[in-house]
């Protein structure tokens, strides 16, 4: 009744204009009401994986969100590796959220992509983000340290209302947050 299945992909690639990027075109052609895009929020990955500047990365995020919004989509921005990125360079990690929010993202979702953020630290970071951003905030925890459910519940306790997970925690590596456990605890 309240769940929505989104199309899922990345912001445009640097070598394409947003309206010419095959991935972004595919997100539109999927005809889902919701699109979730994951963007780099750790400067390490911006430089090493994408080979672009921080400013270019912010532009990719903002242009893609704005384009999807112009096509009538609800947009969830998944800030990939947010907690590691925030630990390394909080200013840049927060600027990725600002780029998405300023372009019209409906949800800002913080991803613990490596699944290694301890719950106390996660709550501290969530509190800082909550102070800076209005609107719907979300959490996407992985279970590498066996903390995905605890971290999802901690984010909810911090005022986050959007929780991403899977049934029984199935997912890459050690899995994602187990929605069956989260729902029962809430």
Model-flagged regions — what are they?
Residues 13-137, 152-160:
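Alpha/beta enzyme core
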Residues 119-122, 149, 176-180:
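Short alpha-helical patches at coil-to-helix transitions and adjacent helical residues
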Residues 144-150:
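Short glycine/serine/threonine-rich phosphate/pyrophosphate-binding segments
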Residues 5-7, 68, 186:
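Generic structural hydrophobic/aromatic packing signal, biased to beta-strands
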Residues 39-41, 158-175:
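Glycine-rich phosphate-binding active-site loops on the catalytic face of alpha/beta enzymes
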Residues 8, 78-80, 111-113, 140-142, ...:
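Structural motif
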Residues 1-17:
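N-terminal capping/small domains of soluble enzymes
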Residues 170-186:
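C-terminal helical cap(s) of enzyme catalytic domains, especially alpha/beta-barrels
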């Amino acid at each position: 009744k309240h769940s929505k299945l989104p199309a899922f992909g990345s912001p445009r690639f640097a070598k394409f204009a947003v309206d010419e990027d095959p991935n972004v075109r595919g997100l539109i052609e999927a005809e889902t009401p919701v699109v979730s895009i994951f963007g780099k929020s750790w400067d390490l990955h911006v430089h090493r994986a994408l080979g672009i500047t921080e400013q270019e990365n912010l532009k990719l995020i903002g242009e893609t969100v704005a384009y999807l919004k112009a096509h009538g989509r609800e947009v969830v921005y998944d800030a990939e590796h947010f907690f590691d990125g925030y630990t390394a360079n909080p200013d840049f990690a927060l600027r990725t959220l600002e780029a998405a929010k300023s372009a019209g993202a409906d949800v800002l979702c913080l991803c613990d992509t490596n699944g290694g953020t301890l719950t106390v630290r996660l709550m501290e970071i969530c509190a800082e983000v909550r102070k800076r951003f209005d609107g719907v905030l979300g959490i996407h925890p992985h279970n590498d340290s066996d903390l995905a459910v605890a971290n999802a519940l901690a984010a909810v306790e911090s005022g986050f209302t959007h929780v991403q997970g899977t049934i029984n925690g199935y997912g890459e590596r050690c899995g994602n947050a187990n929605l069956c456990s989260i729902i029962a605890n809430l």
